[in-house]
Amino acid sequence: MSERKLFTSESVSEGHPDKIADQISDAILDAILAEDPEAHVAAETCVYTGSVHVFGEISTTAYIDINRVVRDTIAEIGYTEAEYGFSAESVGVHPSLVEQSGDIAQGVNEALESREGDTDDLSHIGAGDQGLMFGFAINETPELMPLPISLSHQLVRRLAELRKSGEISYLRPDAKSQVTVEYDEHDKPVRVDTVVISTQHDPEATNDQIRQDVIEKVIKDVIPADYLDDDTKFFINPTGRFVIGGPQGDSGLTGRKIIVDTYGGYSRHGGGAFSGKDATKVDRSASYAARYIAKNLVAAGLATKAEVQLAYAIGVAQPVSVRVDTFGTSTVPEAVLEAAVRQVFDLRPAGIIQMLDLKRPIYKQTAAYGHMGRTDIDLPWERLNKVDALVEAVKTVL
């Protein structure tokens, strides 16, 4: 009897309370970067019934209308009706932002290496905090992501498309998905075992109608038929009713969906959130760099699965460690891959910012449906432009 393994990941829609908070934080970041690419931003958001609080630390020459940014973001998500208990024009907006701590700024603005005489411009910026970050890639999908999180994201994106187009008129913005994939003894995905979808809806919609529409127009549209069989289980709004949702149902906070944002639990996570942070915060930029490295390693055929860990000390430019784990799938020793990575990628914060062009207002679009593996938008850390360089670097190391 072959060994049966199950793995589950989840995603949430743009109308989920925590994702509303993420999108507001990143909309503020983008608005600031559009005027001041050198700004340092750490913007946190809390949302609940009828109210939005924005707080954190910002150092910038830009002036932005935070009230307008917040309301526009909420409207774009779809909270435009007072009956939702949270709407763009009636919500209270309460900003409380201060300047970044001078103690932190001195280490970011002039790294330890620069203070000790290193004249390289890319050694000038120090890491905005200590910490460890992970990036991951696997050959389960064309975008080199784990299948469970890839399908979970696609399901809630499809729900949003049907809601915004009006094709399913009773849908409201809040939704969640969860997909359980069965793997064979070789760790290859063979079928989808369980799909869970909870979607907010108008009170008039019936459970039978919701179930039929979600299965036919969402699940079967997203999940390839080869993965579905008579034993696949569908749980559609299993509580029986989901009218009260969004911030009226639960409060939301920036940074509470870090597993949804990355690999759905399939890879390790360093614990740092992304949204609302400029690229001097290595929680964000180094996580993107680690994904960039891992994806190019797998695309180069150097491994079928790769996890990259980077770690930093606050105020220091060079990473304190670089680790590559291929789980026994690499074609060369992992020490060789680590040496090649150090040759090809400049992993100082300024090097990452330059390599991935991270001073641009590109972040709001990442704040829902995943920061990694996106095929609907062009993100620099998803590009496969280091494949040849990695292959050549491996040859020189060997």
UniProtKB/Swiss-Prot annotation:
Pathway: Amino-acid biosynthesis; S-adenosyl-L-methionine biosynthesis; S-adenosyl-L-methionine from L-methionine: step 1/1. ATP binds at H16, D174, A175, K176, R241, F242, D250, R256, K257, A273, K277. Its main location: cytoplasm. L-methionine binds at E57, Q100, D250, K281. Its cofactor is Mg(2+); K(+). K(+) binds at E44. PROSITE patterns: ADOMET_SYNTHASE_1, ADOMET_SYNTHASE_2. One of its GO terms (molecular function) is methionine adenosyltransferase activity. It catalyses: L-methionine + ATP + H2O = S-adenosyl-L-methionine + phosphate + diphosphate. This is S-adenosylmethionine synthase. The gene is metK.
